[in-house]
Amino acid sequence: MGDKIWLPFPVLLLAALPPVLLPGAAGFTPSLDSDFTFTLPAGQKECFYQPMPLKASLEIEYQVLDGAGLDIDFHLASPEGKTLVFEQRKSDGVHTVETEVGDYMFCFDNTFSTISEKVIFFELILDNMGEQAQEQEDWKKYITGTDILDMKLEDILESINSIKSRLSKSGHIQTLLRAFEARDRNIQESNFDRVNFWSMVNLVVMVVVSAIQVYMLKSLFEDKRKSRT
C-alpha cells in the first residue's frame, strides 16, 4: 500500500468587513475547495485521508492526465471502512456523498500497470450544510441597531454568500478546464512523438529500399563476361 496523506481544512480569511460584522463572520457557509496533482508510479497505490464533519456534502472528482491507457482504479471508503465507490480502469469520475463524522479514505491504485506511471489530478469540494442553519441563527443577534444602514444585515449576508458561491463555481470550472487542457496537451504531445518516430522509421525504410533498388538495377547492366587475353 502506498503513502497515506492527510488533507487539512483550508482557512477562509475574511478582510475589510465593518466592525459590526466581524463578530458574525462565522455566519458564512464554510466550504472546502482544493485540488492536487501527483504522479503515481507503476505498481503502486496512493491513499488520502480527509477529516469530515457531520451532514456535509463531499464531492470528489478525478482525472488521469497522462500515462498509458489513461486509466486508474479508484476506491472511496467511509470512516467505518465501508466501500462507497470502487471503480476499475477509469480515466475520470465524479462522486458526491453525504458525510458523517470521521476520516474518509480515497485511494488511487496503479498496481495493474507494470511499466507505466500515471499523472492524476483530483479535486475535493465540501459544502458543510449541517451547520448553515445554526450559523444563520447566530447572525440574528447582531441585527439590532443595523437598521440605520441602507441595507440590513441579512441582505449583506445574502449578497456575500451569493458572490462567494459564484466565485467558487467559477474557480471550480477554471480548475476543470485546466485539467482538461493538461490532459489534451499530454495526448497531443504523445501523438506528436509517435508520428515523428514512425515518420523516421518510414524514411529509413525508404532510403534502404531505394539503395537496394539502385544496386539491383546497376547489377543488371554490369558486363559479367570475362575478357580473354
From Swiss-Prot:
Residues 218-229 are cytoplasmic. Keywords: Endoplasmic reticulum, Golgi apparatus, Membrane, Protein transport, Signal, Transmembrane, Transmembrane helix, Transport. It is found in: Endoplasmic reticulum membrane; Golgi apparatus, cis-Golgi network membrane; Endoplasmic reticulum-Golgi intermediate compartment membrane. InterPro entries: Emp24-like, GOLD_dom, GOLD_dom_sf. One of its GO terms (biological process) is intracellular protein transport. Belongs to the EMP24/GP25L family. This is Transmembrane emp24 domain-containing protein 5. It comes from Homo sapiens (Human).
